[in-house]
Amino acid sequence: PIRIKGKQLTKNEVEVDGTISSQFLSTLLMIGPVLENGLRITIKGNLVSKPYAEMTVALMKHFGISVSWKENTIEVAHQKYIPQPYKVEPDWSAAAFWYSVVALSKDAEITLSDLQKNSLQGDSVVPELMKQFGVETEFLKDGIIIRHSAFNIKHSTLNIDFIDFPDLAQSLTVLAAALDLKIQFTGIEN
């Protein structure tokens, strides 16, 4: 067994290497308001997966937290979260697997509930990316319908930069292999 004994943090400034992962930043953002002196975060390097950090800030604002983000500096003062209802939106990266099923089928049609076009998730680029794999998306009021299109993708060489949505790399890598496509993936270092 492991025993971890915490202590009260005394400093309110921290530097985060933005080139590794946005998860460290999101964690610090969420604890910032409960720290006695708040938190000032300086991001070193280019922030990968920035949409995930932006989603964290939007969620914090929903619960009453004021966040100041200017260039590579984020400040969160000591504040209280205000509990209130929140509907968690479905996961676009999970939807990518269903898009892959449709891309590999000739006449598949799948309805996915509650996915929204104007999502905060960086992975919400799935509909645009999957056009290249022969999948079209119809946005409905309460979700989406995805269908195989007649687009012939066998003659395409694709270049995809995953820097803002690295969680999609796994499903698209397998799909590209299954379709025997030539694709160059970048931005998956983290």
Regions from the language model: what does each represent?
Residues 1-190:
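Short, structured segments at the rim of ligand-binding sites
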